[in-house]
């Protein structure tokens, strides 16, 4: 599922300079300038927007989903021509289930996560996602694959999105048929075919441009994925600007931008932000000292009693449940750090817990935490909602 994406991230686009892949196509649906910049100005890409944990989860989920329909043959990732040739060989052998089946025609390329081969000309297409719901961009992803296979003469009997069922609870061996939900999207994909054709035609012309296209900032800079070229495309804005206001909604930032309210000087005279956001603006403009709400701090300090404990957790969220009685993406706490002071002015002491790799940490952590924190003591945490 993620092998082609990995190729783009790790090796660049050179391997597909003469192809529109499904990854490229989906990027173009978001904003065609992404592809133009990747090809012509790749050094401007901010790789910090790439969430490696999400990519790793996607790879693990994709690998697991390959077994949904029993035995399968996976097309090894490598040279694209070799992948296409291997797929044809497997299709000729009537291999029932092919993972990463790869197809190319007329400068278009796609790998299908799971392809069920019904006969010489009929197939079913399954696109695997590690999310817990079906997002709009997934329809475009499947629609591009449908378009490529149809151009090659295959009859796509059904298009499906396979995604995580967040209601699944693991008990014993992992049940992948309960872990995954399959949503048929054939009708939606067929309805998008004219749009796919128009997008491909537009993209081919767009990529011929020698001069940098003049596309403005908009929702596409943030959705469906944050764009790694946003810093470059917003370089003409003053620093600081509306997009650097902490806590403001993206819709609010874009509303201000479209009204020409961009600099902090502009923002200081508008009424579209919150009180806390104006404090940030005033601090920057007038060099105010850090804002300290002494009254609220005083009220909080009145609630403090001793012994006093300071608790912090660390957790992870596996897409695939690792332990019994856990769900996909459930927070699994594996570490805590506990500082405490027994009396006012006393020495700051420390206790901690760190789980052993490979073990379910939940019970041992809970038992030690109960032993480390007495009942009815004052316990503080930076993120009370999470630590509770």
What name fits each language-model region?
Residues 133-134, 168-169, 264, 316-320, ...:
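Flexible loop/turn segments at secondary-structure boundaries
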Residues 80-82, 95-101, 105, 109-116, ...:
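Conserved DEDDh/DEDDy metal-dependent 3′-5′ exonuclease domain
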Residues 245-265, 269-280, 347-378, 385-388:
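Terminal, non-catalytic protein-protein interaction segments that mediate quaternary/complex assembly
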Residues 3-120, 250-290:
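Metal-dependent nuclease catalytic cores that hydrolyze phosphodiester bonds in DNA/RNA
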Residues 65, 103, 296-375:
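Conserved RNase H-like, two-metal-ion catalytic cores of nucleic-acid enzymes
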Residues 44, 174-179, 324-331:
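Short secondary-structure boundary/capping segments
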Residues 17, 23-24, 28-29, 53-55, ...:
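Cys/His-rich finger/ribbon microdomains and the adjacent scaffold used
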Residues 117-122, 236, 341-345:
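Short acidic-glycine loop/turn motifs at beta-strand connectors
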């Amino acid at each position: 599922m993620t092998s082609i994406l990995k190729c783009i991230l790790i090796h660049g686009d050179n391997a597909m300079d003469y192809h529109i892949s499904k990854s490229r196509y989906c990027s173009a649906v978001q904003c065609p300038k992404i592809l133009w910049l990747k090809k012509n100005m790749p050094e401007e890409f901010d790789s910090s927007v790439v969430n490696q944990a999400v990519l790793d989860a996607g790879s693990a989920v994709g690998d697991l989903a390959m077994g949904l329909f029993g035995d399968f043959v996976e097309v090894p990732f490598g040279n694209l021509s070799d992948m296409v040739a291997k797929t044809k060989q497997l299709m000729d052998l009537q291999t029932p289930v092919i993972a990463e089946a790869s197809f190319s025609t007329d400068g278009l390329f796609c790998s299908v996560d799971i392809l069920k081969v019904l006969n010489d000309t009929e197939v079913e297409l399954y696109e695997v996602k590690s999310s817990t719901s079906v997002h709009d961009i997934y329809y475009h992803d499947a629609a591009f694959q449908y378009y490529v296979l149809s151009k090659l003469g295959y009859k796509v009997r059904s298009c499906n999105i396979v995604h995580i069922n967040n209601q699944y609870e693991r008990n014993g061996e992992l049940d992948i048929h309960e872990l995954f939900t399959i949503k048929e999207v054939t009708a939606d994909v067929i309805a998008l075919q004219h749009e796919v054709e128009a997008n491909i035609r537009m993209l081919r012309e767009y990529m011929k441009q020698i001069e940098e296209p003049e596309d403005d900032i908009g929702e596409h800079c943030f959705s469906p994925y944050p764009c790694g070229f946003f810093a470059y495309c917003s370089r003409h804005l003053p620093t600081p600007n509306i997009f650097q206001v902490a806590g403001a909604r993206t819709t609010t930032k874009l509303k201000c931008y479209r009204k020409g309210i961009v600099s902090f000087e502009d923002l200081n005279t508008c009424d579209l932000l919150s009180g806390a956001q104006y404090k940030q603006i005033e601090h920057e403009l007038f060099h105010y000292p850090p804002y300290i709400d002494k009254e609220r701090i005083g009220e909080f300090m009145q609630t403090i009693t001793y012994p006093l404990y300071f608790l912090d957790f660390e957790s992870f969220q596996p897409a695939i449940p690792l332990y019994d009685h856990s769900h996909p993406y459930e927070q699994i706490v594996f570490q805590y750090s506990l500082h405490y002071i027994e009396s006012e002015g006393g020495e700051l002491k420390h206790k901690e817990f760190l789980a052993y790799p490979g073990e379910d940490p939940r019970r041992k952590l809970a038992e030690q935490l109960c032993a480390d924190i007495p009942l009815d003591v004052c316990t503080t945490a930076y993120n009370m909602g999470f630590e509770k």
